[in-house]
A protein has these predicted regions:
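Acetyl-CoA-dependent GNAT
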Residues: 36-94, 104-105, 164-165
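Conserved GNAT-fold acetyl-CoA-binding loop/helix
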Residues: 17, 21-44
Length: 182
């Protein structure tokens, strides 16, 4: 399977919308109940790229096969060296072809260059494919919040996974913006 990893552009908003939207009706992938608009994703891509990577996997036919993006772990200043990531593959993207792994490797490499220390993944606890991916990538389970969300008539828990990608030298420097690191 031929594909490349690149930074997302606002022109990828429709594809990101469609990929994420395919998971919204499922109770075991995301707690989102209604998929936001394409314009929401256009803004999200632009705003994310100011600080964090927003990557897409693009097939040889230019179709977007998946994406990975970062967001703040928590709003408080002391958390600024941590990033929560989201990774999604298109419903029809081939599995076990290295797409998710390639997205992760590029994502983690960029975050490390920026000076981030930890990547966190927050998964619905019944999403075994995502659990397996995080374990394969070297993440460690950091917590389990039972019955954290209610969707489609069921309570679901979330699992927190974490991976250290930066050094633990003190005192840490403020992370660079994505453009400063590239």
């Amino acid at each position: 399977m031929e594909f490349k990893i690149r930074l997302a552009t606002e022109g990828d908003a429709q594809a990101v919308h469609d990929i994420y939207g395919s998971y919204v009706p499922l109770d075991y992938v995301t707690f989102t109940v209604e998929n936001p608009s394409v314009d929401h994703y256009r803004k999200k891509i632009a705003e994310t790229l100011e600080k964090y990577p927003f990557l897409v996997a693009e097939g040889a036919d230019k179709k977007i096969l998946g994406y990975a993006c970062g967001s703040p772990l928590r709003p408080h200043d002391a958390y600024q060296w941590n990033v929560e990531w989201t990774i999604m593959l298109a419903e029809d993207a081939p599995r076990r072809q290295g797409i998710a792994t390639a997205l992760y490797k590029e994502f983690a490499q960029l975050l490390a260059l920026q000076g981030y220390r930890y990547i966190y993944g927050v998964l619905v606890d019944t999403n075994q494919a995502s659990v397996a991916l995080h374990k394969k990538l070297g993440f460690k389970e950091a917590g389990h919040f039972e019955n954290a969300g209610f969707k489609m008539g069921k309570w679901r828990g979330i699992l927190w996974y974490v991976k250290e990608i930066g050094s633990s030298n003190e005192p840490p420097k403020k992370p660079l913006s994505l453009s400063e690191a590239m």
